[in-house]
Amino acid sequence: MKLLAATVLLLTICSLEGALVRRQAKEPCVESPVSQYFQTVTDYGKDLMEKVKSPELQAEAKSYFEKSKEQLTPLIKKAGTELVNFLNYFLEL
């Protein structure tokens, strides 16, 4: 009977010590994934800024904007003319 009581007491003490050790251990930081995400975004931003500085990309962007301006200018003028005609129609009523 004493052996059984000693065994139960020993098991109880061991499990309590194990729980205490688990509580004292550092928990994994919750901020770690968030900080990793922001670090990744920062790295991508730096890489993007390096790529934007290249003259080839700047020339390509400039030609793209000039081409879109050439294509959109007639459409905008036509839309403006049609808007004026539309408003004149209502003013003549």
Swiss-Prot record:
Job of this protein: May stabilize HDL (high density lipoprotein) structure by its association with lipids, and affect the HDL metabolism.
Pfam families tied to this protein: ApoA-II (PF04711)
Segments passing through the bilayer: none
Subunit structure as annotated in this protein's UniProt entry: Homodimer; disulfide-linked. Interacts with NAXE and NDRG1.
Record InterPro entries: ApoA-II, ApoA-II_sf
GO annotation terms (biological process): cholesterol homeostasis; cholesterol transport; lipoprotein metabolic process; positive regulation of phagocytosis; protein stabilization
Residue numbers bearing the Phosphoserine modification: 54, 68
Location, primary (coarse class): secreted
Signal peptide location: 1-18
Official protein name in the record: Apolipoprotein A-II
GO terms, molecular function: cholesterol transfer activity; high-density lipoprotein particle binding; lipid binding
Top-level taxonomic group: Eukaryota
Gene3D superfamilies in the record: 6.10.250.100
Methionine sulfoxide modification, residue list: 49
Family: Belongs to the apolipoprotein A2 family.
GO (cellular component) term, any one: spherical high-density lipoprotein particle
Subcellular location: Secreted
Coiled-coil features, chain-numbered ranges: none
Keywords assigned: Cleavage on pair of basic residues, Disulfide bond, HDL, Lipid transport, Oxidation, Phosphoprotein, Secreted, Signal, Transport
The keyword Secreted appears for this protein: yes
